[in-house]
């Protein structure tokens, strides 16, 4: 079943029932929940998972419990959204789509999951016009449109006995007010001593007139399918599709440790290959930023 609650100041006709009907044949216990406000959808699902784990420990005599069921949690407004490396994600009702998908997952290799998620999102939002891909993917977790950030992905996991529960957070700009970005960019400059990023873009630059509900219906069910495909097949099923949208391939990049080089695509498990003066390096965890000379952060 599905639930939806909408604030009076920003009513949205969320397609919760349609998404549930599309997904439940594969995940019978799947639910969709929409909250008017939360600090972070990822934080909320991680809290629920920890609380359920503690409850299970207190009832250990009853046997080994199952991990929490699959859920899609949507927030109309996040007041403490999080991105990779603890970065803030600003979210206002109607301006952004913010949601998290949580489900038990047991892939043979977790490497490349965020890239697979990005592939699914980009393919779901790409206009079917037979043209070259418009939406690009910046390793490891950003969606780009016109070399500006459209959205981001945050993947977190929690242990549940011998199982793991994954929480996949997604934030997409539907329409981003300039004043929101200006404040965030100013704060970023004060906090990091780095130049402020370029202004983000939004889905309305690609699909004029769309709203967050439209975007959710476009991406939700295909994302669930992609995650299940990743569980069975790993990153191999997504590698070529990622390469077709790789925003960094052939570009000069700078790593957070100061190393500079040219991005040369991703490996079999999603690591970024960078050709440096000391040879080819495989990067799996360091933050990557495009050189300032490329005019993109």
Predicted regions and their residues:
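N-terminal lobe of the biotin/lipoate ligase/transferase fold
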Residues: 1-130
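Long, positively charged amphipathic alpha-helical accessory segments at protein N-termini or as interdomain linkers
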Residues: 2-12, 27, 53, 106-135, ...
């Amino acid at each position: 079943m599905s639930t939806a609650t909408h604030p009076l100041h920003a009513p949205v006709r969320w397609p919760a029932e349609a998404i549930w009907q599309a997904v439940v044949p594969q995940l019978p216990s799947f639910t969709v929940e929409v909250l008017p406000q939360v600090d972070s959808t990822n934080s909320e699902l991680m809290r629920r998972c920890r609380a359920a784990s503690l409850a299970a420990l207190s009832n250990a005599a009853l046997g080994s419990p199952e991990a929490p069921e699959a859920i899609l949690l949507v927030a109309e407004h996040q007041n403490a959204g999080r991105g990779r490396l603890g970065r803030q994600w600003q979210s206002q009702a109607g301006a952004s789509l913010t949601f998290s998908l949580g489900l038990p997952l047991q892939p043979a290799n977790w490497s490349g999951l965020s890239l697979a998620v990005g592939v699914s999102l980009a393919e779901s939002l790409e206009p079917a016009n037979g043209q070259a891909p418009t939406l690009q993917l910046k390793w490891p977790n950003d969606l780009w449109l016109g070399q500006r950030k459209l959205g981001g992905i945050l993947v977190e996991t929690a242990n549940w006995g011998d199982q793991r529960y994954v929480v996949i957070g997604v934030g997409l700009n539907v329409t981003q007010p300039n004043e929101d970005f200006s404040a965030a960019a100013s704060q970023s400059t004060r906090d990091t001593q780095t130049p402020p990023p370029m202004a983000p873009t939004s889905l309305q630059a690609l699909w004029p007139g769309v709203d967050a509900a439209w975007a959710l219906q476009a991406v939700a069910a295909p994302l669930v399918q992609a995650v299940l495909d990743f569980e069975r097949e790993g990153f191999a099923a997504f590698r070529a599709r990622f390469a077709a949208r790789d925003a960094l391939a052939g570009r000069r990049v700078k790593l957070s440790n100061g190393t500079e080089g040219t991005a040369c695509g991703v490996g079999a498990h999603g690591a970024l290959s960078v050709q440096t003066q000391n040879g080819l390096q495989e990067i799996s965890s360091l933050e990557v930023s495009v050189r300032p000379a490329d005019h993109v952060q």
